[in-house]
C-alpha cells in the first residue's frame, strides 16, 4: 500500500474528484478526514465509503473553509487526535459560468474566497503540523482553464491561475522543510455537474480531446495518490495536467 497509515485531509471530499480521491487514499491504506460543506453530505459520503470498504478509517467534518477560525480549529483537532497530518488535498471549490456583463463584485469574491482563500486557510492549518514532523504533502486542485481561460465565469479561471501560483510559491518556501507542494489540473471530467450537460453541448467538447473521451474522477484520484506517495518524493512545484491533451 502506497499510503499505509498516512493521515490525509481531503476538502471537497463528498463527491466527484474529491470523493474519488478519498476512496483511492483509503484503498492505499491511508486514514482520511473528509471535509464537506454540510454535515449531511459528509456523513452520507462516509457511510457510503464504509459500506464499500468496511475496514476504511474515514471521518467527516464540515468547517466553513472561508472562516479562518473554523479551519484553524478543525486542523488543530485533527492534529491533536491523530498526532500528525501527513497529506492535505485542497480540492474544495466552486465553478460558475456567469457572462461578464452580468458579473458582480460579490460573485467574484465568493469564487475567490473558496477557491483561493479557503485553500490558503487550509494550508495554514496543516503546515505547522507538517513542519513539526519534518515532512508532508500538499496537493491542490487546479484546472485546465487556468492555462486557457473560458468564455464565461471569469472568476473561475482567475482563481485556478492563482492556485498554480500559490502551489509554485509554497513549494519553494516549504521544500527546505521537507514539505512537497504540487497541483493537479483536471480537464473535462465525468462528474455530476458534467452529466447534467446536454449531449449536444458535450459532444463538441469531447471532439476536442485527442484521447477521444472525457476523463473519470478515479483517473484524477490516481494522480493525487502518485503525488502523495514516496514514488513522487523528488517532485514538488509541479502542476500536473490530467486532461487527455484537451486544449480549450
Where are these regions (language model features)?
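C-terminal substrate-recognition "lid" of short-chain dehydrogenase/reductases
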Residues: 2, 120, 135, 213-242, ...
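Residue(s) in the substrate-gating loop at a strand-loop-helix junction
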Residues: 143
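Substrate-binding pocket helix/loop in short-chain dehydrogenase/reductase
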Residues: 99-100, 107-109, 194, 201, ...
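Short, small/polar-rich loop/turn modules that mediate ligand/substrate recognition or access, typified
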Residues: 89, 175, 180, 235-237
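Conserved glycine-rich cofactor-binding loop
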Residues: 7, 14-16
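Active-site helix of classical SDR
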Residues: 123, 159, 167
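Alpha-helical segment proximal to the catalytic Tyr-Lys
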Residues: 128, 172-176, 233
Amino acid at each position: 500500500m502506497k499510503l499505509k497509515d498516512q493521515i490525509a485531509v481531503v476538502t471537497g471530499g463528498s463527491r466527484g474528484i474529491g470523493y474519488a480521491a478519498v476512496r483511492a487514499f483509503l484503498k492505499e491504506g491511508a486514514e482520511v478526514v473528509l471535509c464537506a460543506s454540510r454535515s449531511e453530505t459528509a456523513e452520507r459520503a462516509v457511510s457510503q465509503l464504509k459500506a464499500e470498504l468496511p475496514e476504511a478509517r474515514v471521518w467527516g467534518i464540515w468547517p466553513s473553509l472561508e472562516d479562518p477560525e473554523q479551519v484553524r480549529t478543525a486542523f488543530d483537532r485533527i492534529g491533536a487526535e491523530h498526532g500528525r497530518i501527513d497529506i492535505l488535498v485542497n480540492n474544495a471549490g466552486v465553478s460558475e459560468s456567469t457572462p461578464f456583463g452580468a458579473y458582480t463584485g460579490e460573485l467574484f469574491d465568493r469564487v475567490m474566497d473558496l477557491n483561493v482563500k479557503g485553500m490558503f486557510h487550509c494550508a495554514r492549518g496543516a503546515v505547522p503540523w507538517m513542519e513539526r514532523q519534518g515532512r508532508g504533502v500538499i496537493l491542490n486542485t487546479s484546472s485546465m482553464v487556468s492555462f486557457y481561460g473560458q468564455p464565461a465565469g471569469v472568476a473561475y479561471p482567475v482563481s485556478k491561475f492563482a492556485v498554480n501560483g500559490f502551489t509554485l510559491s509554497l513549494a519553494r518556501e516549504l521544500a527546505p522543510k521537507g514539505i512537497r507542494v504540487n497541483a493537479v489540473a483536471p480537464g473535462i471530467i465525468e462528474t455530476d455537474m458534467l452529466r447534467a450537460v446536454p449531449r449536444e453541448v458535450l459532444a463538441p467538447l469531447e471532439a476536442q480531446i485527442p484521447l477521444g473521451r472525457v476523463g473519470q474522477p478515479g483517473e484524477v484520484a490516481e494522480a493525487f495518490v502518485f503525488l502523495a506517495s514516496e514514488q513522487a518524493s523528488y517532485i514538488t512545484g509541479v502542476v500536473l495536467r490530467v486532461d487527455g491533451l484537451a486544449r480549450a
